[in-house]
Design a protein with these regions (language model features):
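Short, well-ordered turn and helix-capping elements at secondary-structure junctions
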Residues: 10, 15, 23-27, 44, ...
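Active-site-proximal cap/loop segments of hydrolase catalytic domains
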Residues: 69-193
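Short hydrophobic segments within beta-strands
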Residues: 24, 39-40, 120
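Non-catalytic accessory segments flanking enzyme active sites
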Residues: 1-32, 54-57, 61-62, 103, ...
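Short, low-complexity, polar/charged sequence segments that are solvent-exposed and flexible
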Residues: 8-11, 40-43, 56-59, 85-88, ...
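ATP/adenylate-binding site constellation spanning eukaryotic-like Ser/Thr protein kinases
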Residues: 16, 37, 137
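Short substrate-entry loop that stabilizes the transition state in hydrolases
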Residues: 29-34, 39-78, 152
Length: 193
């Protein structure tokens, strides 16, 4: 079995920001339209790389195109890029993933099937899948959340009281304060939808 090739690219998000992503296509793609798996990374302060990923390769081997978006808030693209994701779990970070999906399925050269698409993710990526299920349900046929965060406020509340004060301050700046930002966190949590 041949490995699929992953190609990195940049696209323009709906608000004009440049966002990095990568697309993996099956090694023996046929002429028929390919189903798509959108696979956001965990973290969210992490990133995907163009390198061997057993999950991506397995999906590609089974005939799926796999899109991985390094949404704002991802590490490795500079401090400003990472900071642009602060308190944006269900906002700009989510929109970047959706914009990336819309970009690739609208490219006629890629031959992707927008009507056969799924979001699959773990940890923060699972959160993206859950959030897509209530914010973007019209775009996808399935949502798979593996250990995804369904209640951001609850997560931050538990970390707020169990971690050192420096970590609490960092979490409040990056993700939100469980008390001060309660409404924002509740609105972006799948448990409330």
């Amino acid at each position: 079995t041949r490995l699929a090739t992953t190609k990195a690219f940049w696209f323009e998000a709906s608000d004009g920001e440049q966002v990095q992503a990568q697309l993996t296509l099956p090694p023996d793609a046929k002429t028929s339209k390919l189903p798509v798996i959108v696979m956001p990374h965990g973290g969210p302060n992490a990133r995907d790389f163009v390198r061997f990923d057993p999950f991506v390769q397995t999906f590609a081997n089974r005939g799926y195109a796999v899109l991985q978006v390094n949404f704002r808030g991802s590490s490795g693209f500079g401090k400003a890029y990472e900071a642009a994701g602060f308190k944006q779990w269900g906002g700009l970070m989510q929109e970047d993933v959706i914009d990336g999906f819309k970009q690739v399925v609208s490219d006629p050269n890629l031959n992707l099937d927008a009507d056969r698409a799924c979001v699959v993710g773990a940890s923060y990526g699972g959160y993206v899948a859950l959030t897509a299920s209530f914010k973007n349900a019209d775009l996808f046929q399935c949502f798979v959340s593996i250990a995804g965060i369904s209640d951001i406020g609850s997560l931050l509340q538990s970390e707020f009281y169990t971690r050192m004060s420096e970590t609490r301050a960092m979490n409040a700046a990056r993700h939100g304060d469980p008390v001060v930002d309660r409404a924002l966190l509740a609105g972006d949590s799948a448990i409330n939808h």
